[in-house]
Amino acid sequence: MIYWLNGAYGVGKTTVAEALQPQLHNAHIFDPELIGNGIRDNYPANLFRETFEEYPLWLETNYRLLKDLYERYEGDIVVPMTLLREGSYAAIIQRLLDEGIPMKYVYLDADEATLKHRMIDSGREEPDSWCVRHIPACLAVQTADTHAIHIDTVGRTPEDISQEIAALT
């Protein structure tokens, strides 16, 4: 099973993924950001894009790696990654589903005040950081994403949220 954890920057995707990992069968955390950083770091500046989702190679590489991992790995796969574009869902998640690969696509919900508190008040981000500036775009996806199982994260611990996700199986 693949568990894709989508949500706004600062919602706690990675923390929830780490709490979820021991609750699943031999779970592996797959990090699409590593692929994105590798692609972006090796492209010249004139090919730089604002988000990894704008690189067709990022979409294709994540799809292929997740398919390969699912076919070869004896365990669950947890993917904590924000997707802002509908086309990214189609290019990765829908393709995997169309091939019969089981997936739980979860959107971790939070309001703007909670997200800012988690990022700014904790000292992880500056008020003018890229992640904070993109909160409105993330919230627009949160309200529009009809593909996902939505889980409210406000006032909840990562352990509590991860238990709810683990119970989805």
Q: In which residue ranges do the predicted regions lie?
A:
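Hydrophobic anchor at the beta1->P-loop junction of P-loop NTPases
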Residues: 5
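ATP-binding Walker
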Residues: 11
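Conserved substrate/cofactor phosphate-moiety recognition/catalytic segment
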Residues: 17-64
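Conserved phosphate-donor/acceptor-positioning beta-strand/loop module used by diverse small-molecule
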Residues: 99-119
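P-loop (Walker A) phosphate-binding loop of NTP-binding proteins
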Residues: 8
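Walker A/P-loop
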Residues: 14
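Glycine-rich phosphate-binding loop used to anchor ATP phosphates in small-molecule kinases
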Residues: 54-103
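Small-molecule kinase domains that catalyze NTP-dependent phosphoryl transfer to phosphate-bearing small molecules
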Residues: 121-164
